[in-house]
């Protein structure tokens, strides 16, 4: 039996459940058509002489779901591709304990759940999977509408109008001058009368003492 067919048969018979041995990130990702995607699978055990496989599942996980073998990473040979994938679009490389699946120029038909897997003895160990959704247009985030607060009207008191030109008219000035003259004349008359009365009183007193 060819290795690829054996691998797919083993994946069909395995009970799929997320393992803490292989931690995949992110759990869900949505990208636009023709973009690049990087999916990470971190191994919590030593994989010096082991292989890491990447599979794709196009439908929701179930007992009869089908898995496509995409590529594997081998410590000696590097990336080994499936015969059914475009090699220039799929690459697997290692970064310390992480195994990265790199997909370029993705299409909507590349959408699905991607699993990393290691073949043990006798069981298969799967990661929890990363769901990839490829869309033509990414949804835009609607900006929250700001409530406009009505502006308060400020009541302003009318300013007193400043009088332009001279403060007093010629008529007013004339009346003021006339009033001052009348007061001065009245004061002079009062002083004159007071002096005459005093003189008359002095003359009367002189006659009395003679």
UniProtKB/Swiss-Prot annotation:
Gene Ontology annotations for the cellular component aspect, listed alphabetically: cell surface; plasma membrane
Signal peptide: 1-21
Transmembrane annotation, as ranges: 171-191
Assembly and oligomerization: Forms disulfide-linked heterodimers with CD8A at the cell surface. Interacts with CD3D; this interaction couples TCR-CD3 with CD8. Interacts with LCK.
Protein name: T-cell surface glycoprotein CD8 beta chain
Domain of life: Eukaryota
Record's keyword terms, sorted: Adaptive immunity, Cell membrane, Disulfide bond, Glycoprotein, Immunity, Immunoglobulin domain, Lipoprotein, Membrane, Palmitate, Signal, Transmembrane, Transmembrane helix
Primary location recorded for the protein, binned into one broad class: membrane
Gene Ontology biological process terms, A to Z: adaptive immune response; regulation of immune response
Extracellular topological segments: 22-170
Domain Ig-like V-type: 22-132
């Amino acid at each position: 039996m060819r290795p690829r067919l054996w691998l797919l048969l083993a994946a069909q018979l395995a009970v799929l459940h997320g393992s803490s041995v292989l931690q995949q990130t992110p759990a869900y990702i949505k990208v636009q058509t023709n973009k690049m995607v990087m999916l990470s699978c971190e191994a919590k055990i030593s994989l010096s002489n082991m292989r890491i496989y990447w599979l794709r599942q196009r439908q929701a996980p179930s007992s009869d779901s089908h898995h496509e073998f995409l590529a594997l990473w081998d410590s000696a040979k590097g990336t080994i591709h499936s015969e059914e994938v475009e090699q220039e679009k799929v690459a697997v490389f290692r970064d310390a304990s992480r195994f990265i699946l790199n997909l370029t120029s993705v299409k909507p038909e590349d959408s699905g759940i991607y699993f990393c897997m290691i073949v043990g003895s006798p069981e298969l160990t799967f990661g929890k999977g990363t769901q990839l959704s490829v869309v033509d247009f990414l949804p835009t985030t609607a900006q929250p509408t700001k409530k406009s607060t009505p502006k308060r009207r400020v009541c302003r008191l009318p300013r007193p109008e400043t009088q332009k030109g001279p403060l007093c008219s010629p008529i007013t000035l004339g009346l003021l001058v006339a009033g001052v003259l009348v007061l001065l004349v009245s004061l002079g008359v009062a002083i004159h009368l007071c002096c005459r009365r005093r003189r008359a009183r002095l003359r009367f007193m002189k006659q009395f003492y003679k």
